[in-house]
Design a protein with these regions (language model features):
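Short N-terminal helix-initiation segments at or just after the protein's N-terminus
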Residues: 17-22, 34-38, 94-101, 231-243
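Short charge-dense sequence patches
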Residues: 6-7, 38-48, 102-111, 120-128, ...
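A generic structural signal for short, non-catalytic loop/turn and secondary-structure boundary residues
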Residues: 11-13, 48, 82, 101, ...
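A residue-level signal for conserved active-site and pocket-lining positions in enzyme catalytic cores
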Residues: 23, 92, 156
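Short amphipathic alpha-helical segments with coiled-coil-like heptad repeat character
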Residues: 31-33, 100-102, 164-168
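Short gly/ser-rich loop at a beta-strand->alpha-helix junction or flexible surface loop bordering the NTP-binding
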Residues: 20, 49-61, 67-132
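Hydrophobic alpha-helical interaction segments
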Residues: 137-255
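Short beta-edge/loop segments at beta->alpha junctions of small alpha/beta modules
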Residues: 1-84, 181-201, 208
Length: 255
């Protein structure tokens, strides 16, 4: 069986990703021949090398560009890397209906160290955290499998925690305005073990003073105010010296 035939057989069975080691193990296929054939198929836009030793078969609808969107293969890739993950930030917000600030690349959260994805072929914008809160993830069918993504509450908190990564607090607030109806404030307590009180303070401040979501702000305050010993004076951003801080509002957040 030729490599072309082998790839076709995988494709019709719905197996759209494969590793180089699987090709090397084909009967009668030497490693050097396999590398040459794989390189040719990349040039011909039959397959895309999205990670060292990991390939995705390019379906006809993406053949012209030669690049497959990350949602097509992200679950298989992360299983290959043996890393937990979830689609996060602007990409997760879009899945919840907040589409006006959609990210150009698929934003994916995982644990360090950073996967060595090719910048040329990569369609992924990586962010990192200490651990992945799997209990706060949802799943959805993609074109060829499933993807895991953050629930509305984790998405809201991540938008604040990683505001710099997505373009700042103004952009985070714009997305939160669209996302707010999906967020169950009472469930924010489930996110607390995976973030800091400073992030929650900033989220509350934005809800109350930027988005004027008074009811949600009040509810959030009631959820988290029981342990204000962990609250410190914080800045909305870190552009000013801390000695300028004043206890100006109940969230203890200064502009």
């Amino acid at each position: 069986m030729t490599l072309h035939e082998w790839i076709y057989q995988r494709e019709i069975r719905g197996q759209v990703t494969f590793s180089a080691n699987e090709v090397y193990s084909m009967p009668g296929m030497s490693a050097s021949t396999a590398k040459t054939e794989l390189a040719r198929m990349v040039v011909r836009r039959r397959v895309q090398n999205v990670y060292k030793g990991f390939y995705v078969i390019i379906p006809p609808q993406y053949a012209l560009k030669g690049i497959v969107p990350a949602t097509y293969y992200i679950d298989s890739l992360m299983q290959y890397l043996n890393k937990p993950y979830y689609v996060a930030l602007l990409s997760a917000a879009a899945l919840h209906g907040a589409t006006h600030q959609r990210a150009m690349l698929t934003q994916v959260m995982t644990v360090s160290p950073r996967p060595n994805i090719s910048e040329k072929n990569g369609q992924i914008d990586w962010s990192f955290r200490k651990d992945v809160p799997e209990s706060l993830l949802l799943s959805e069918n993609s074109e060829m499998g499933i993807i895991h993504y953050s629930n509305p509450e984790l998405t809201a908190v991540d938008l604040i925690q990683y505001a710099k990564h997505i373009g700042g607090y103004q952009r985070a607030a714009t997305v939160l305005a669209e996302l707010a109806d999906e967020v169950d404030i009472s469930k924010i307590s489930d996110v607390l073990p995976y973030t800091s009180y400073a992030v929650i303070q900033r989220l509350g401040y934005i809800l109350e003073y930027v988005l004027f979501e008074q009811e949600k702000a009040d509810k959030l305050y009631s959820v988290v105010c029981h342990d204000k010993r962990k609250w410190h004076l914080v800045l909305l951003s870190n552009e000013h010296p801390k000695d300028e801080l004043a206890d100006a509002n109940r969230w203890r957040v200064n502009m």
